[in-house]
From Swiss-Prot:
It comes from Dothideomycetidae sp. (strain 11243). The chain crosses the membrane at residues 26-46, 64-84, 97-117, 122-142, 146-166, 266-286, 302-322, 380-400, 409-429, 487-507, 533-553, 898-918, 936-956, 1017-1037, 1121-1141, 1151-1171. ABC-type transporter; part of the gene cluster that mediates the biosynthesis of the antifungal antibiotic FR901469, an inhibitor of beta-1,3-glucansynthase, exerting antifungal activity against the pathogenes Candida albicans and Aspergillus fumigatus. FR901469 is a cyclic depsipeptide containing 12 amino acid residues and a fatty acid chain. Probably involved in the secretion of FR901469. Keywords: ATP-binding, Cell membrane, Glycoprotein, Membrane, Nucleotide-binding, Transmembrane, Transmembrane helix, Transport. The gene is frbG. This is ABC-type transporter frbG. Residues 619-845, 1216-1447 form the ABC transporter domain.
Length: 1476
């Protein structure tokens, strides 16, 4: 027992041995361990009470509430009893005992009030009470032990023990979540937001997710909800407000914005990171103290010292585990916030960006949401390391100076030199990464176009050429990336250069400079304490270099975001026309000058009209220039007034600016000079290229409008969609596909038109809505919408329609002609048709046309009949880890892998063996063998050189040889899978999902897999080597390692059942983001015109949230694993400490004990590296697995029997035979062609006509093998197409599909993609089509095709140039002139007739008068050939037939059979009789 007098000092330790060695005094425990935490907690509790009183109730009183209050009331009662006991004179006490007891009692009363408010007004248990009571329990255990050894203190000790039990009970109750008591809206919060501090510190809240992933396949529904603070809506509204006040012209503006906005989350990681530094730098003191303890085992206080050393080891290593997990978790929470902000801000700014004319706007945004965001995530992971490394270096320098004196200067100077070089590498790496990202951007731009225009690319046989161009861009990207990878190799070399040579320099200086060591030999305590500090010093240097490079990479990506946002803001601010999405209405003309000007314009353009007042004016322009920039003015000096409830027709030749004018009316074009004023906020807009979302037909038509079934039916009828829907298996629930690829061109146009009609907006802006429609369908739509009793007239809507179709002339109130140099406006009653009709063509159908508009239609393009399918999820446990590893090893090369592994093992040996060499050195010094100093120093130095050689060799081999090889092979595997995929397969798959494989998956494979692989392999081998060294120090530690390894095995087995699934979900959730961004960019003008911007932003936020869930929760389970493995290291450290203290005989020499203790420090650091690398590698390999599955599972369009090789000059003649052909787009779908039989003689010119959706395009699709046959056969020059590879067929034909596909590159590349023609031949065909005068000033054949020809009609002409310049015997044109004005169309027809001499020509058209000069005309209806004869015979047939009749194939044959040409089944078509 101990007297109270011995414990009434401030201590901290008692001087009486009877109280126990190294025992705290009771006064110290009361004044420091009790009073300090209590005082802080009371102050914070009062502030927290004030805060909670302002909160709304979130939970009800339940049994947990009453249990907690009961525990606190009992605790207060016990404290009151204890206070009374302390006041008794006979009770032994210190001078502070009564005061502490009184304050404790009073504080418990405060805690009762706080507990009540925390339960009722907070969704989670009280962090403050939990932290205080846990801390209090730890200190009270020490106080309880002290009270029980005080003489005469049994009563107060018993009472205090009861209080300790009650504190423990309350801490357990307070740590329980109050799920059952929470109100319903708070139950949707993330478990992290509803759980206790202890639960969050040890990541117990992720255990349910880990168990779910262990037992079953995860899907998005199994993931936790995000808490409110990291939800995208919250992040956007917070950051958007700050962005408005940010000057984006300043460097680093976006980065600083994120730091300011989320500073508290950033700072939340500072305290645990500082704690980690404290715990980490406690290790050298523990090593020194342990070695001292080992040398003085016989001391009187050795037992107590050993016990405290065990406690200290436990505290330090458990503290390292918790603090490291805490700061990294806060880092990733900050990254999640930054990620959510950037994705939502970019989309919001994209929604407000300027439209582009011809320049593809997609690639920059796609790179920003994929590659750049990944670089930012990776860079910010080391943000706390950047500043903490300086603290670590300073502390390490101070500690080294205590051990090595002035010898510290050269070693630390060398380390700082590495830091300086590291900063330079970081700057260089940032600029080189920018070049790499720009190369990725170019590749993704072309890849996106190929995927979205897949059918056109296939039909034109440009898929291999496009793929070769993509491969070329990939090779350039890899070449550019090598410069960046050299920086990475240099960075890693600098990191390990300090690690290897700093100890060598320090020990060499110390031993060779007598003035420094002063005859003090390098003993084990000094050597291994110094080695421990060197490990921490070099870790700080390596962390700084690594974090500096990563941060610079992140900064460069932040700057790309800033530049993109700045460009959009600059464009927005420079516009003169008001924008639709502004909150206020655009300004009207208010002054009398404006009114007078409007009167003048109206007087100049109308006869005897009363000028309207401002309320009747919809659009006003005066001497306005319109274009896409100040250098690209398209419409000059436009003066126009569009009045409400009128129809305005805009006409003009191709490239005259019709589409640009409509864009200007939406505020989407560049305005120069006086403004173009719009007196409306929203308009129904139909783009020239119909934009459709990848949704159902019904969803596209409804858009954001409320559901009105009657009006919906009226809209379908007016737009002639009812017959089409009747032929689709899913009707209006048919998904339209990427870019509407599951619909025909005419159907896409009519769905877009129906969307405009259904919206019932006052303003209709319609661009070329009759292209791709047959005459009868056009006539029906024009009458139903524009006629005297049409929907537009009845509703009093204002309509501006851009078209050259003569159907609108008699219905328009005014006509704007853009084809006469300067715009000319003509009112309806002015019969001045000459300036107009030059650009207008008649599309009325022949009288008595047999092509019935009311008949059921067939879908012409792709898989329109396919039922709505759920996206097929990739299996997440299909491939074993071994198979994926082996697949990746094969891509990088088995020999390359073996070389790299050997270099890694050499590196580990050269870095681990020096500690053993130092042990032998100090033991030799201890024996007095000081004459071999040169040997030890030289070997030490050469080991460092060997390590450096192995490091540089291994890093260069990995980054400059292995990674580029795998990058090429895996990209080629993806691209090859796409190239050989059938068209229906690609149209079924979402374009965003496919593109995500070329962006996100390859980004991970190029960056994460090699870096994580190197870190994992090196750390793993190092951990094994260091574990062996630790085990050598004691056989007991070896015995303890066995169950530890078994435990680690089961931990990783449990963890790896979930983490790859989460990574797969993470990758899958990014695909909709990319797809949504693509969809938005392509339909930007339409979305803004309809006023759907807010809806699309909300959808983007939902997609961001769905993407954030797996991303954030993956980082959480990674922290769980890191914490568990760090606790395993803590267990090893505690076991080692116990073994050393318990081994009375000193089982290991001081040298090997020093190695064990030093290796334990390095083992913890390397295990941390192994954890980070391994978790990164096993999740990054998910991307490799996705590539492997996609390349293996993607269907191939060529069948085994399609393997014959035709003659090199096939087809020689161009004879085409269809023999009883029936075709459909898949099993269970409607036949799109039924029993079609005909023969086309060599050199014939055949026109194919029929209403929209009749099967014309399906018929020519069978020729290009993009549509499979159910039965029958097709022969060209007597060779069945089913026996040939499909691309061989396409290359032999000359195809011109409906949708023009322009290759990225020069005009020369587009016209002559296979490099067969001379420049003169290319120029000739361009001149023939009227393109050369446009292209010559822009660079001629070297001009960029996309930017030089912005108008869709010009792109179509360029594709015609490609078609006409190609050699070949069979030419197939599918409605190719549908978007051309009559003048351009006439030029094209003339060129076709000239250049098709001697060729077989098939031309799909909507009306027979477009086919003058053709030998025969084929009429297709409902998938059947109903007529096939000379133009005169077909014209007579159509004129004599009733439009309401429903002819069959046989009846048509009977009517048209004459001589050599028959429509009925031909029989054996290869025989002479069949050809007679």
């Amino acid at each position: 027992m101990c007297s109270i007098a011995d414990l009434d000092g401030i201590g901290p330790f008692s001087s009486n041995p009877q109280c126990g060695h190294l025992s705290f005094t009771l006064l110290f425990e009361e004044a420091v361990l009790a009073a300090v935490p209590l005082g802080l907690c009371v102050v914070l509790a009062l502030l927290r009470v004030r805060q909670l009183r302002l909160q709304s109730p979130k939970a009800r009183r339940d049994r947990l509430y009453y249990a907690k209050l009961t525990a606190l009331f009992l605790l207060a009662s016990v404290q009151l009893v204890q206070l009374i006991q302390w006041t008794r004179p006979s009770t032994p006490k210190t001078r502070a005992s009564i005061a502490i007891a009184a304050v404790s009692f009073a504080s418990t009363i405060v805690f009762i009030g706080l507990c009540h408010l925390e339960h009722i007004r907070s969704a989670k248990p009280s962090d403050l009470l939990t932290l205080y009571f846990v801390t209090c329990i730890a200190f009270d255990i020490i106080r309880t032990r002290t009270l029980w050894i005080v003489s005469g203190g049994t009563a107060v000790a018993s009472t205090f023990t009861v209080g300790l039990v009650l504190r423990l009970l309350f801490a357990l109750l307070e740590s329980r979540p109050k799920t059952r008591a929470l109100q319903r809206q708070y139950l949707r919060e993330s478990p992290e937001a509803r759980t206790s501090l202890i639960n969050r510190l040890f990541f117990w809240w992720v255990n349910p997710l880990l168990w779910t992933g262990f037992k079953r396949i995860l899907d998005p529904g199994h993931l936790f909800n995000l808490d409110r603070h990291i939800s995208s809506s919250h992040l956007f509204h917070v950051s958007a407000q700050r962005l408005n006040d940010t000057d984006l012209s300043k460097s680093y503006a976006v980065l600083l914005l994120c730091l300011r906005e989320y500073k508290w989350t950033f700072l939340a990681g500072v305290l645990p990171r500082l704690a980690l530094t404290g715990f980490t730098f406690a290790q050298p003191f523990l090593v020194t103290r342990f070695l001292s303890y080992e040398s003085n085992r016989d001391a009187r206080d050795a037992g107590a010292t050993g016990t405290w050393l065990i406690v200290a080891y436990a505290g330090v290593y458990i503290g390292i585990a918790i603090s490291q997990a805490g700061y990294i978790h806060q880092t990733f929470r900050f990254i999640t916030m930054v990620r959510g902000s950037l994705l939502t801000l970019l989309y919001h700014d994209t929604m407000n960006k300027g439209s582009s004319a011809g320049i593809d706007p997609t690639s920059a945004e796609l790179t920003l949401v994929s590659a750049d965001i990944e670089k930012i995530q990776m860079g910010l992971q080391t943000m706390h390391q950047a500043w903490a490394s300086f603290v670590d270096i300073c502390l390490a320098t101070w500690l080294l100076e205590r051990h090595l004196g002035l010898a510290t200067i050269p070693s630390v100077g060398f380390s700082l030199l590495c830091v300086v070089f590291g900063g330079g590498v970081a700057v260089m790496a940032g600029s080189r990464q920018t070049l790499w990202l720009e190369a990725i951007q170019k590749r993704l731009g072309l890849t996106s176009d190929v995927i979205n225009m897949f059918k056109s690319v296939k039909m034109t046989a440009l898929v291999n050429i496009s793929a070769a161009r993509v491969l070329e861009l990939r090779d350039k990207e890899i070449t550019v990336s090598k410069k960046f990878r050299r920086c990475l190799v240099f960075m890693v070399s600098l990191t390990y250069l300090s690690n290897v040579f700093a100890p060598i320099i320090g020990f060499t200086t110390y031993t060779l400079a007598p003035a420094i060591h002063k005859n003090n030999i390098l003993d084990s305590a000094r050597a291994f304490s110094s080695l421990t500090i060197f490990a921490l010093l070099t870790e700080g240097v390596g962390s700084f270099v690594h974090s500096a490079v990563n941060l610079m990479l992140a900064v460069s990506s932040f700057e790309r975001y800033r530049t993109t946002l700045l460009e959009k803001h600059t464009w927005h601010e420079s516009k003169k026309a008001s924008r639709r999405w502004t909150l206020t209405a655009p300004p009207l003309l208010e002054n009398t000058d404006a009114e007078q000007w409007a009167l003048e314009v109206l007087a100049a353009t109308a006869d005897a009209h009363t000028p309207p007042d401002d309320k009747q004016v919809c659009i006003q322009a005066r001497d306005t220039n319109i274009g896409w920039s100040s250098e690209k003015i398209v419409v000059q000096s436009l003066s126009l007034v569009v009045r409400k409830r009128e129809i305005t027709l805009v006409t003009g030749p191709t490239n005259s600016g019709k589409s640009t004018l409509l864009r200007a009316m939406l505020g989407e074009a560049w305005i120069e000079g006086p403004a173009l004023h719009r007196h409306f906020d929203r308009a129904a807009y139909c783009d020239q290229i119909p934009w459709l979302a990848n949704k159902t037909i019904r969803q596209n038509i409804l858009g954001g409008s409320p559901v009105d079934e009657d009006w919906y039916e009226t809209t379908l009828q007016a737009c002639q969609l009812k017959p089409d829907l009747g032929r689709l298996a899913q009707g209006d629930q048919t998904v339209v596909g990427n870019e509407g690829s599951r619909l025909s061109g005419g159907q896409r146009t009519r769905v877009a038109l129906a969307r405009a009609v259904y919206s019932r907006l006052d303003i209709m802006l319609l661009d070329d809505i009759t292209s791709g429609l047959d005459p009868n369908t056009t006539k029906s739509i024009v009458e139903a919408l524009f006629g005297k009793d049409g929907l537009f007239r009845r509703a009093g809507q204002t309509v501006v329609v851009a078209s050259n179709n003569a159907s609108f002339l008699s219905l328009a109130d005014q006509v704007v002609d853009l084809g006469s140099g300067s715009p000319k406006v003509t009112r309806r009653n002015v019969e001045s048709s000459s300036p107009v009709t030059a650009h207008v063509h008649n599309q009325t159908s022949p009288k008595g046309s047999r092509i019935d508009s009311a008949r059921g239609s067939l879908d012409e393009i792709s898989v329109a009949d396919f039922r709505l399918e759920e996206p097929k999820r990739e299996p997440r446990r299909l491939d074993s880890d071994t198979s994926i590893y082996m697949y990746y090893v094969r891509t990088v090369g088995v020999v390359n892998t073996a070389v790299f592994l050997a270099l890694c093992m050499a590196l580990v040996f050269a870095m681990v063996f020096p500690s053993i060499w130092v042990a032998w050195w100090v033991e030799a010094n201890a024996r007095g063998e000081t004459n071999q100093l040169a040997k030890y120093l030289l070997v030490y130095f050469f080991l460092g050189v060997a390590a450096l050689i192995a490091l540089i060799g291994g890093g260069s081999h990995l980054m400059l040889r292995m990674v580029p090889r795998s990058a090429r092979i895996l990209h080629r595997a993806l691209l090859d899978a796409v190239v050989v995929a059938p068209v229906p397969f690609m149209t079924r798959n979402d374009a965003g999902e496919t593109l995500n494989r070329f962006s996100q998956d390859l980004e991970i494979i190029d960056t994460d897999v090699p870096l994580s692989g190197f870190t994992t392999l090196f750390a793993f081998i190092t951990c094994i080597a260091q574990a062996i060294v630790v085990c050598v120090s004691s056989p007991f530690v070896t015995a303890g390692m066995v169950p530890t390894l078994v435990l680690v095995y089961f931990i990783q087995k449990f963890y790896l059942r979930t983490s790859p699934q989460l990574r797969a979900l993470d990758l899958e959730a990014k695909a909709p983001l990319i797809g949504h961004m693509q969809e938005t960019l392509r339909g930007l003008a339409t979305i803004r015109a309809f006023g759907w911007a807010e809806d699309y932003e909300e959808r983007n936020m939902r997609l961001v949230d769905e993407s954030q869930k797996p991303f954030y929760q993956l980082t959480c389970i990674q922290r769980w694993l890191g914490l568990v493995l760090d606790l395993v290291v803590a267990g090893i450290a505690i076991l080692l400490a116990i073994v050393i203290v318990s081994d009375k005989n000193g089982g290991a020499t001081s040298g090997f004990l020093g190695i064990a203790l030093t290796s334990l420090v390095s083992f913890g650091l390397n295990l941390g590296g192994f954890i980070g690398g391994w978790t990164g590698l096993e999740t990054a390999l998910t991307a490799v697995a996705r590539v492997k599955r996609f390349s293996a599972d993607t269907a191939k369009e060529d069948l085994p029997e399609e393997c014959q090789t035709p003659p090199t000059d096939w087809p020689q003649r161009g004879e085409i035979v269809f023999d009883d052909v029936t075709a459909s787009y898949g099993p269970g779908t409607t036949d799109v062609l039924s029993n079609v039989s005909f023969r086309i003689s060599p050199g014939e010119k055949i026109g194919i006509i029929g209403r929209t959706g009749s099967g014309k395009s399906s018929l020519v699709s069978t020729l290009s093998r993009t549509l499979d046959l159910i039965s029958g056969s097709i022969l060209i020059d007597s060779i069945p197409l089913s026996s040939l590879p499909r691309d061989t067929v396409r290359q032999a034909l000359i195809n011109m599909p409906q949708d023009a596909f322009v290759l990225h590159g020069s005009i020369r590349t587009n016209v002559d993609p296979r490099s067969r023609l001379t420049d003169e031949a290319i120029t000739e065909v361009l001149t023939e089509l009227g393109l050369w005068p446009i292209l010559a000033p822009l660079g001629g054949l070297d001009a960029d095709a996309v930017s030089a020809l912005p108008a869709q009609g010009l792109k179509q002409l360029l594709c015609f140039a490609r078609v006409l310049a190609q050699p070949g015997r069979v030419m197939v044109l599918d409605e190719a002139t549908s978007r051309l004005d009559p003048e351009a169309s006439a030029k094209v027809k003339q060129a076709i007739m000239r250049r098709s001499e001697g060729r077989t020509l098939l031309t799909v058209a909507h009306k027979i008068d477009e086919l003058d000069g053709y030998d025969r005309i084929m009429v297709v209806d409902a998938g059947k050939v109903v007529a096939f004869d000379t133009p005169g015979a077909v014209q007579g047939y159509l004129s004599s037939s009733s439009p309401t009749s429903s002819p069959t194939c046989s009846s048509s044959a009977a009517a048209l059979s004459s001589g050599a040409h028959r429509v009925a089944a031909v029989g054996v078509l290869g025989t002479e009789a069949g050809r007679a």
